[in-house]
Amino acid sequence: MKIGDVEVRDDVFNVKVKKHVLWEVVKWQLAKRRQGTHSTKTRGEVAYSGRKILPQKGTGNARHGERGVNIFVGGGVAHGPKPRDYEYPLPKRVRKLGLKMALSDKARNNAIIFVDNIDLGKKPKTKKAIEFLKNLGVEKEKVLVVIPEKADVLYKSFRNLPNVRVLLPEGLNVYDVLWANKLVIQKDCLDRIYKKVEA
């Protein structure tokens, strides 16, 4: 299969897309990102006395015990959130398959652009980054740029643009691929992308 003038592997860029697999991987990724630091106090943790607030009988009011129960304002929360880890295991095979499907989906929609080199000069300039995107005709799209090595000039030039994300091939993931309308990939990243979906 060819994308532009680049020959790519069918088993990575031309796989049958199953939406459910993509959904599974994205759900797993977002669950992993959750902080899970939410916390509420139960009736045992709120700062109230355990004294009975009114007699059991004779007042005409409903029966009550202490002030810290969940039915009172300022009382504890019943079944509220406690700190927890939302991460759960997802088979590697499914994760790799998800990435292949996401790349295949973009390839099918002509949303992948291969470039020989991304040269924005020696100093970070957002202006040059915008020019680069304009030359590719993707300045108004959400763009994922895949580069072969960490380059401060590239990261800093693109980071001021809210619709652009920059990743190394090893950091390529289903969520970011699906987020982008266009993928701009430097040609010498291809082998490392293949390695990622095989490893």
Swiss-Prot record:
One Gene Ontology term from the biological process aspect of the record: translation
Keyword ATP-binding: no
Keyword annotations from UniProtKB, A to Z: Ribonucleoprotein, Ribosomal protein, RNA-binding, rRNA-binding
Molecular functions per Gene Ontology: rRNA binding; structural constituent of ribosome
Gene3D superfamilies in the record: 3.40.1370.10
Taxonomy, superkingdom: Bacteria
InterPro entries to which the protein is assigned, alphabetical: Ribosomal_uL4, Ribosomal_uL4-like, Ribosomal_uL4_dom_sf
GO cellular component entries: ribonucleoprotein complex; ribosome
Its job: One of the primary rRNA binding proteins, this protein initially binds near the 5'-end of the 23S rRNA. It is important during the early stages of 50S assembly. It makes multiple contacts with different domains of the 23S rRNA in the assembled 50S subunit and ribosome.
HAMAP family noted in UniProt: Ribosomal_uL4_B (MF_01328_B)
Subunit-level organization: Part of the 50S ribosomal subunit.
Family: Belongs to the universal ribosomal protein uL4 family.
Protein name, as recorded: Large ribosomal subunit protein uL4
Organism, as annotated: Aquifex aeolicus (strain VF5)
